[in-house]
Amino acid sequence: MEQRTFNQLLAAAVKNGTSDLHLKAGAPPALRINGALLPVKVPALMPEDTRAVADFILKGSRWKGSLDDLRDWDTSYAVEDVGRFRCNIFRQKGNFALVLRAIPFNVPTVESLGLPPVVKSMAEYERGLILLTGVTGSGKSSTLAAIVRQINETTRAHILTIEDPIEFLHEDKLSRITQREIGPDTVSFSTALRAALRQDPDVILVGEMRDTETIEIALKAAETGHLVLSTVHTTDAAKTISRLVDAFPAEAHDGVRHRLAENLKGVISQRLLPKATGKGRAVAAEIMVSTESIKEFIIDKDRTHEIAEYLSKNRDVYGTQSFDQHLSELYKSGVVTLDVAKAASTNPSDFERALSFE
């Protein structure tokens, strides 16, 4: 496959609202649209096609070895006037395969993502830890980018991001933004995060809390007066707290819970759901903000499970919300269908019963 043909494929994919493009030998390209993976009506790709795509993408990356030595590699790829793409190149059945995720040129706003005002207010925090959680492909990177944009447009600060790879490209507005990528700019999240503390940041974005060392340094950064933004692969606030605590030895758990209680300012847990129109996906989110009660739930491991109920009862007071509350709102406003809302709810039968009483 020639590079021009590949770029045309990417342009068509973006035009059709594709989130991911899959390429492998022996099958036609496939596009993930509204969460469904759909084959393109073209002939199956040959091994030389996927090899050619891997080759010209790698020529613009930091890969310096022989193509034949590559087994797995993360990089990015850009097409002018089309967009940027996060790219994973790998082998399957001895041949090259690729998955590319579309990253729009334009950085989203909190409003454009359909998130409530409380998310925008999180950008006003001067210190602490804010976490975006959800499964792969739940829109965490977009929400992080929207929060960074909000800070950038309203605050004179130094925002330092550590990403693998860099996704959204930010331009300096009121803030000064430094974007570092694992590989060409630094060797790991933990190394870059440790160095960041000597680079006079006000806000630090860490692409992912991958290991205990990164979590520890992020907590220290929050404790020393920085606002730290990051992601965790968990599905709600309670599970996020447990995941962070369990990353440490058992004897450290009580101390970590107290540190999280003092420094964890917010958790946004997301899912992407197909819209009722069949075009695009909507964000459904559980949102936790720090309160005295939340601090107690974090410290007491036997009460952490109470967080979800607390969030649903204090929406009008603190702007918090449970998943089911947001799902109900999305259904009533016609954004998603009842079947989609029920399937995504904590308990489908309870969810439908609750709707009947409203």
What does each of the following model-derived ranges do?
Residues 1-358:
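Short, flexible helix-loop junctions that flank or precede catalytic/ligand sites
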